Amino acid sequence: MTLNLDDFQKQDIKFDIAKLQQAYKEIVKTQKFEDAGVTNFGAISLTQIPGDPESIKGSKARGVFWTKPDQSGKEVSRDIDINEEAYSEFIKDYENTYFKEVYDKLSSKYKLGRVRILLKQPRSTLSWHRDPEPRLHIPIITNPGCIMVIDKVAQHMPADGSVWI
């Protein structure tokens, strides 16, 4: 088997990791992670559907994904469909953080939907799943044992301000 790292696409854009980490620390002082009823999962939404604060709560913090829950190997849909394009309003509580600058720069280059800070507890994993569209990832806090797996390739994405698809 030949390993193919093409699924890990480092983008030609980078942010100040110290500023990202400081903005994260500021937000978690006042905001609780929405767990959507899932163990070891947490999200703080930075965007919402304009004028709709309910659009970032419960299952809407996660949105639809596909998984293979049993030995049949068949994919099944989980959670609720989300109209990613509708999440176009940056939440006012976070406008004075570095995340707003990051959002503005990414918005000028990519078509964004929901933008979230995601939390994975130490020694926890997400089960295998497939998202409905490509996702941008910017690791903010991580360690060398933290890896992303795409197909059969595992890779560590360092917290250095890089943006990955």
PLM feature spans:
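Tight coil/turn sites that cap or link beta-strands
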Residues: Q121-R123, D160-G161
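Short, conserved beta-strand element in jelly-roll/cupin
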Residues: L119, R130-C146
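A structural signal for short, well-ordered beta-strand segments and their strand-loop junctions
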Residues: G37, R114-I117, H137, M148-V149
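Contiguous ligand/interfacial binding patches
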Residues: V163-I165
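A short beta-strand-loop-beta hairpin characteristic of the jelly-roll/cupin
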Residues: P139-D160
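A short glycine-rich, His/Asp/Glu-containing loop-to-beta-strand
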Residues: E101-P122
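Non-heme Fe(II)/2-oxoglutarate
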Residues: M1-V102
